[in-house]
C-alpha cells in the first residue's frame, strides 16, 4: 500500500539478534531498517553485511517488491543505487551504546536513533554514571560524532522540544502526529 502511494517505509526489526534477516526484510520493500538496542560492534558488522549489496556488503539478490527496483533492470546499477540510497539506522538505548557510539557509527550507518524511554531505564539502572540525563547522552554522542557521516535522530515527540534538539545538533526529529 505504501509503495502504491510512493511513500518510503522504515521498518524496525523485532530484536537485535535478527540483524542477519535484514536483507530478507528489505526484499519486501522498505527503504530503511532500524535495529533496536545496538551495543556491539559485531551487530553493526552483521547489519552492514546484510543491508548492502556487494561489493559493500553481502546482501543477496532477490525480491520483486524491493524499494526502487521498478525501472532498474540492471543488477549492478540497482545494487549501486541501493548502496547509496537505503537507510540503515541503529537505536541507541543504553549507556553502553552511548559510550561506544564512535565504534558503532561505522561507514554505512546512516542514522543513530534515540529511544529516550529505554535509555532512561538504563540511566536509572546506573545512577552513579556520569551521564544523568538523556540530553547528557545526546550531547556526548554529538561530540563523539563530529565529522562523521552518521546523523542523530531523536524522538522528541512534540514540536515544543524541536528547537532544543536542533540547537544541540540533532538533524532528524521524530514527532507524534498532530491531531
Provide a role label for each language-model segment.
Residues 1-18, 23, 27, 49-61, ...:
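Alpha-helix-loop-beta-strand connector modules within alpha/beta enzyme cores
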Residues 20, 28-107, 116-118:
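Conserved anion-binding
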Residues 9-13, 33-35, 88-92, 112-114, ...:
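Hydrophobic faces of well-ordered beta-strands that scaffold small-molecule active sites
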Residues 162-178:
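Short, electropositive alpha-helical surface patch
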Residues 42-46, 122-124, 179:
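Short, charged, surface-exposed secondary-structure boundary motifs
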Residues 26, 105, 163-167:
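Non-catalytic positions within long, well-ordered alpha-helices that form the structural scaffold/packing
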Residues 15-17, 93-97, 157-159:
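Short beta->alpha connector loops
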